[in-house]
Regions:
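Acidic/His-rich, divalent-metal-binding segments that scaffold phosphate/diphosphate chemistry
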Residues: 1-75, 79-84
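Amphipathic alpha-helical segments in well-structured domains
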Residues: 83-84, 88, 129
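Short helix-to-loop capping/linker segments positioned immediately adjacent to catalytic or ligand/cofactor-binding
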Residues: 95-102, 118-124
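Amphipathic alpha-helical segments within well-ordered protein domains
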Residues: 42, 46, 88, 92-96
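Divalent metal-dependent phosphate-bond-processing catalytic cores, especially two-metal-ion Mg2+/Mn2+ enzymes
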Residues: 1-4, 29-54, 65, 117-230
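Acidic/histidine metal-binding catalytic segments
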Residues: 53-61, 98-112
Length: 230
């Protein structure tokens, strides 16, 4: 990858994400997190590209820019769903200035546009590179940091035990469904399933802990498939 291209892309991404107009609780830390996430997605994308044999630099650049659409002033949840399409529009002239061909720019922008909800507002091809933008985003969103963030977002520590149990079960069911989600490449599929399996194991262990956090009360059973304690 060309260092000059990467450095220019870094500066552009940082300038756009620093705006973060979407977040009402905008703080320097919120912007910093979004930048950190973008870097992780870029590294994941480059790893996928290297394993699959397509352009690492363009994949890295597209992934690094995937969330710059957050810099606009949004009014509702639909605007949030559009942030990939908005990001593609912001990225297009910048990518052209970097010297990429028209076809290369469109492929990268298509990947940025579809990474949220698999839809774009312009025609494009679902190439491995384009699909990798969304795949890399999802892979990072289901890694270790989001375990912490997911529990923090529901104030898990302060939930009553019954609600903690219910939350764990809901998450486990959802993760089992998400594990079947198709990815654009074999490498992304492997990485995705590894992340989901990691979370499933965490929530299996957490579920065991919350189930054993009180004395059995229904027929002397800790678990539905256990014999009553004597």
């Amino acid at each position: 990858m060309r260092e000059e291209i990467i450095k220019k892309t870094e500066r552009f991404m940082q300038a756009e994400i620093s705006k973060l107009a979407f977040f009402q609780d905008n703080t320097p830390r919120m912007a910093q997190y979004r930048m950190e996430h973008s870097y992780r997605v870029a590294h994941i994308g480059a790893e996928i590209a290297a394993a699959e044999g397509f352009d690492r630099e363009r994949t890295f650049v597209a992934c690094l820019l995937h969330d710059i659409g957050y810099s606009l002033d949004y009014r509702d949840k639909q605007d949030y769903r559009n942030h990939g399409r908005y990001g593609a529009a912001i990225a297009r002239p910048f990518l052209t200035e970097l010297g990429y061909s028209g076809a290369e720019v469109e492929e990268m922008c298509y990947g940025i546009a579809i990474h949220v909800d698999d839809m774009a507002d312009f025609e494009g091809e679902r190439t491995p590179l384009a699909l990798t933008v969304g795949d890399a985003d999802n892979i990072d969103r289901f890694d270790a940091y989001r375990l912490y963030e997911g529990l923090q977002n529901v104030d898990y520590m302060n939930l009553p035990l019954r609600e903690q149990k219910a939350h764990v079960e809901r998450v486990r069911q959802r993760l089992a469904e998400l594990r079947q989600m198709p990815c654009g490449t074999a490498t992304a599929t492997r990485m995705w399933q590894e992340k989901i399996d990691y979370q499933l194991e965490f929530y299996r262990r957490l579920g065991h802990q919350v189930q054993t956090s009180t004395w059995p009360s229904e027929g002397g059973k800790c678990f539905p498939d256990e014999k009553p304690l004597l």
